[in-house]
């Protein structure tokens, strides 16, 4: 722990990113409480470095017990399929306490944390590709919160015309499409580093370049759940926006959202509290913020997705944009509820 703390202190002093390669079974219990104090020192420095220098955790094997908390405090977590695991209590403890038999992969494997928990931001098939992914991510990030993200000269003209963009957003408001196709057409060389690709896929987040300058992208994904906002997507996007704001990375929002996901499950689990995190992140961010309304922009979700009212710097509307207090079906149900109740066939 003392070695790790020394590196963390030096990184903060020099304004350098920290990459941690983690393969740990937890605290060495032979050292008693002293081992816990070592963990505490690491965690404290993770917190002090948050928003000051980029912190990346690479899980190269098991990360159990106290070893999982440091990665959880960092900005990005990489895992390797079939060889890396993260859990607070391992399968043996689960068996003893709950009498449940579960494998390390089922409990805290890469697929679990990439799809279900959202703990893992990137998953690769082997260690070599995992480390390549770390290098790719670092190529988009500044060394600290004082510097700007690396500029990369490009021969891709900013004013190029993409005729196919005219037809990518369907005129039918209920027809799904993949917003990634739009992202690839507008970014430099069509490159886009997507983050947390398999978690809360109804919203897309990632890094790209425009004219050589790094930009964070947040985009509703109509292909999944019609692009509605739920708890997981709200938290996912809010965390990314906070990171971009900390490290001077402008944010482009591509909006096509019919609203927040309705239902008792979402309400009981705290959609109000979690949805507010996205609202707070956008409002608090001081980096340049641009929004393009691609199609739907309804109700509270319209406000949350970087509307001008909460501080959006420039807001543009695609030709297919629809901005309203709610969708047409909901508006009809409220405005004409008496007529509908009296009608012989309300559906007609």
Predicted regions and their residues:
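Ligand-binding clefts of soluble mixed alpha/beta catalytic domains
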Residues: 1-348
């Amino acid at each position: 722990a003392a070695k790790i703390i020394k590196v963390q202190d030096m990184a903060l002093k020099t304004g350098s990113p920290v990459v941690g390669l983690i393969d740990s079974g937890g605290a060495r219990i032979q050292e008693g409480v002293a081992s816990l104090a070592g963990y505490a020192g690491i965690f404290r420095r993770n917190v002090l470095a948050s928003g000051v220098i980029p912190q990346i955790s690479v899980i190269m094997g098991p990360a159990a017990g106290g070893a999982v908390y440091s990665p959880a405090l960092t900005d990005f977590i990489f895992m390797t399929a079939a060889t890396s695991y993260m859990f607070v209590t391992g399968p043996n403890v689960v068996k003893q306490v709950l009498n449940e038999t579960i494998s390390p992969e089922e409990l805290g494997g890469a697929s679990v944390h990439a799809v279900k928990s959202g703990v893992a931001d990137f998953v690769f098939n082997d260690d070599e590709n995992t480390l390549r992914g770390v290098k790719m991510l670092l190529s988009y990030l500044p060394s600290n919160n004082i510097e700007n993200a690396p500029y990369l000269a490009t021969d891709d003209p900013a004013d190029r015309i993409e005729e196919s963009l005219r037809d990518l957003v369907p005129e039918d408001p209920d027809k799904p499409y993949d917003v990634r196709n739009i992202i690839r057409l507008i970014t430099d060389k069509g490159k886009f580093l997507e983050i947390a690709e398999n978690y809360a896929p109804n919203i897309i987040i990632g890094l790209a370049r425009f004219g050589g300058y790094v930009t964070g992208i947040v985009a509703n994904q109509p292909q999944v759940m019609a692009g509605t906002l739920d708890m997981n997507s709200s938290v996912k996007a809010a965390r990314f926006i906070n990171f971009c704001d900390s490290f001077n990375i402008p944010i482009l929002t591509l909006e096509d959202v019919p609203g927040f996901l309705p239902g008792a499950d979402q309400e009981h689990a705290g959609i109000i509290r979690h949805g507010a995190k996205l609202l707070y992140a956008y409002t608090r961010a001081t980096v340049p913020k641009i929004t393009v309304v691609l199609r739907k922009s309804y109700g509270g979700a319209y406000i949350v997705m970087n509307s001008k009212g909460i501080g959006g710097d420039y807001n543009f509307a695609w030709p297919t944009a629809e901005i309203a207090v709610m969708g047409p079906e909901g508006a009809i149900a409220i405005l004409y509820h008496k007529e509908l109740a009296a009608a012989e066939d309300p559906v007609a």
